[in-house]
Amino acid sequence: AFAGILADADCAAAVKACEAADSFSYKAFFAKCGLSGKSADDIKKAFVFIDQDKSGFIEEDELKLFLQVFKAGARALTDAETKAFLKAGDSDGDGAIGVEEWVALVKA
């Protein structure tokens, strides 16, 4: 997963920890999968995997399917989880998370 940035086992454990609807916490998830401890460069590399349409931004529909990027077959985030995740990361209020906003969110 993630081109060697994160261990598959760590990603699977992070996804498993938020299997229940409305149990997703981005801070807990980033810590459990190991992303929050990575360098800004590695965090930017992870951004590319999540930005599925390659727009340079992570939009709401990409956040909804966020867990599936870490582990195939994972659940979609609920609308409430997705909106809270977007609100936490979208510091300039443009409705999407840019790469610098992403680094700040992961390191928060």
Curated annotation (Swiss-Prot):
Residues 38-73, 77-108 form the EF-hand domain. The modification N-acetylalanine is found at A1. This parvalbumin has an isoelectric point of 4.50. Ca(2+) 2 binds at D90, D92, D94, A96, E101. InterPro entries: EF-hand-dom_pair (IPR011992), EF_Hand_1_Ca_BS (IPR018247), EF_hand_dom (IPR002048), Parvalbumin (IPR008080). Disulfide bonds join C11-C33. Pfam families: EF-hand_7. This is Parvalbumin beta. It comes from Merlangius merlangus. The keyword Metal-binding applies. It comes from the Eukaryota. Gene3D superfamilies: EF-hand. One of its GO terms (cellular component) is cytoplasm. Ca(2+) 1 binds at D51, D53, S55, F57, E59, E62. Keywords: Acetylation, Calcium, Disulfide bond, Metal-binding, Muscle protein, Repeat. The keyword DNA damage does not apply. Belongs to the parvalbumin family.
